[in-house]
Swiss-Prot record:
The protein's name: Elongation factor P
Keywords: Cytoplasm, Elongation factor, Hydroxylation, Protein biosynthesis
GO CC entries: cytoplasm
Protein role: Involved in peptide bond synthesis. Alleviates ribosome stalling that occurs when 3 or more consecutive Pro residues or the sequence PPG is present in a protein, possibly by augmenting the peptidyl transferase activity of the ribosome. Modification of Lys-34 is required for alleviation.
GO biological process: peptide biosynthetic process
One Pfam family this sequence matches: EFP
Modified residues (N6-(3,6-diaminohexanoyl)-5-hydroxylysine): 34
PTM (free text): May be beta-lysylated on the epsilon-amino group of Lys-34 by the combined action of EpmA and EpmB, and then hydroxylated on the C5 position of the same residue by EpmC (if this protein is present). Lysylation is critical for the stimulatory effect of EF-P on peptide-bond formation. The lysylation moiety may extend toward the peptidyltransferase center and stabilize the terminal 3-CCA end of the tRNA. Hydroxylation of the C5 position on Lys-34 may allow additional potential stabilizing hydrogen-bond interactions with the P-tRNA.
GO molecular function, one term: translation elongation factor activity
Length: 189
């Protein structure tokens, strides 16, 4: 299997540490006045999203992780797993609720998602940065009710709850940032 030397480290590189697939979040090369140079690296575990910091001596090598990212389309829920299909090969990937994580609240039929595979098995799903969803329930905004600028909670068609401005009504379609779970704008038809 391929390996990377410390001088090849950069953000986004996927490596295998203690049998766990990790992605390099941050890499800092340190050359102390005395002693050997080293790399201080922040790594994010792809299985559980934990971030750890490790140091590697200059010239040390790390095994490359067998991690693959595929663009897929969400098809349906199968009772105990979520089914995603590759749009060209029609290959289906069964994803557990555990691997789905926070992305579950943004799932919409026929939308595209990134499936992360480790050794051929799906380990996580990444939603698009922005999704358009319909508001199925929110309190009506009262005219002149502008004392609080925090907005009001709105339940979306996927079951997610986000805070929206007072002028947004039930039945409207809004754009939501999936990374922060925040309202971005109304979507014009």
């Amino acid at each position: 299997m391929a390996s990377y030397s410390t001088n090849e480290f950069k953000g986004g590189l996927k490596v295998l540490i203690d049998g766990n697939p990790m992605v390099i979040v941050e890499n800092e090369f340190v050359k102390p006045g005395k002693g050997q140079a080293f790399n201080r690296v922040k790594l994010k575990n792809l299985l559980n999203d934990r971030v750890v910091e490790k140091t590697f001596k200059s010239g040390e090598s790390v095994e490359a992780a067998d991690v693959e990212e595929l663009t897929t389309v969400y098809s349906y829920f199968d009772g105990d797993s979520y089914v995603f299909m590759h749009p060209e090969t029609f290959e289906q990937y069964m994803v557990s609720e555990e691997a789905l994580g926070e992305t579950k609240k943004w799932l919409k039929d026929q939308d595209e998602y990134q499936v992360i595979l480790f050794n051929g098995q799906p380990i996580s799903i990444i939603a698009a940065n922005f999704v358009n969803l319909e508001i199925i329930e929110t309190d009506p905004g009262l005219k002149g009710d502008t004392a609080g600028t925090g907005g009001k909670p709105a339940t979306l068609s996927t079951g997610a709850v986000v805070r929206v401005p007072l002028f947004v009504q039930t039945g409207e379609i809004i754009k939501v940032d999936t990374r922060t779970s925040t309202y971005v704008s109304r979507v014009k038809d």
